[in-house]
Regions:
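Conserved anion-binding
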Residues: 31, 47-48, 57-104
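Chitinase-like catalytic core of GlcNAc-active glycosidases
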Residues: 36, 41, 97-101
Length: 104
């Protein structure tokens, strides 16, 4: 049994693919106690936080390129009692996330 499941959620806007939503996460949560890291590869991650929290996510990873105020989003994720991860596209400088590393 896996200790960790990484779930890529794509919206066909931020990235050119479309994948699963909260209903699928909820369905697999019903049969698994494994840690779920939900990677929001979406244009507006804030819009999906509550749905994935209710579906059973343990952590949310968002892309730094999708938010104007990463600190606020980090606080919102933490307020849902979820762990936080930050991701970036290959062309995005690593320095974009360094100011937030002490918050995650």
């Amino acid at each position: 049994m896996a200790d960790y499941i990484h779930i890529d959620v794509m919206d066909n806007h931020f990235v050119p693919n479309l994948t699963i939503g909260p209903a699928v996460v909820k369905s697999i949560r019903f049969v698994s106690k494994t840690y779920f890291d939900v990677h929001l590869m979406v244009t507006n991650p804030r819009r999906l936080l509550n749905s994935f929290a209710k579906a059973g996510a343990n952590g949310i990873t968002f892309h730094i390129e999708t938010v104007d105020n990463p600190g606020s989003l980090i606080d919102q994720i933490k307020s849902l009692k979820l762990e936080v991860g930050i991701s970036l596209k290959p062309a995005t400088p690593l320095e974009e996330i360094t100011p937030f590393l002490d918050q995650i």
